[in-house]
């Protein structure tokens, strides 16, 4: 079995986002798997962060945008790790993706799909 030198980050909260960006900026290809429809985790629900009371969205939003735009990151939102096989340095991971009902590569964030469903 050939070795595919890539990294899997499970969880798209602020820690997973930071890990994915750090690894991608170091030249690794990163697969970021998040079980919810969007990344951001609990931090996306907060107004301010502790202990500095910095604006949570001001920290998180640029990082979320950077994940989507980074050529070394493949984002699989609304997905879960179903199985892990292999050995150290050569794993095979099965990811189960939930249906999105949109073509993600064509999405420009216009929210017209939400209007169609409401």
What are these regions (language model features)?
Residues 1-15, 31:
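Beta1/beta-strand and adjacent pyrophosphate-binding region of the FAD-binding site
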Residues 24-38, 42, 72, 85-94, ...:
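Iron-sulfur cluster-binding cysteine motifs and their immediate structural context
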Residues 20-21:
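Generic hydrophobic/aromatic pocket-lining and core-packing "Φ" positions
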Residues 1, 94-95:
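Short, structured interface segments
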Residues 65-73, 78-81, 85, 96-108:
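A structured beta-alpha segment of the ubiquitous adenosine-cofactor-binding alpha/beta core
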Residues 44-79:
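N-terminal glycine-rich dinucleotide-binding loop that anchors FAD/FMN and/or NAD(P) in oxidoreductases
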Residues 13-16, 53-60, 106, 110:
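Generic structural signal for well-ordered, non-membrane alpha-helical segments
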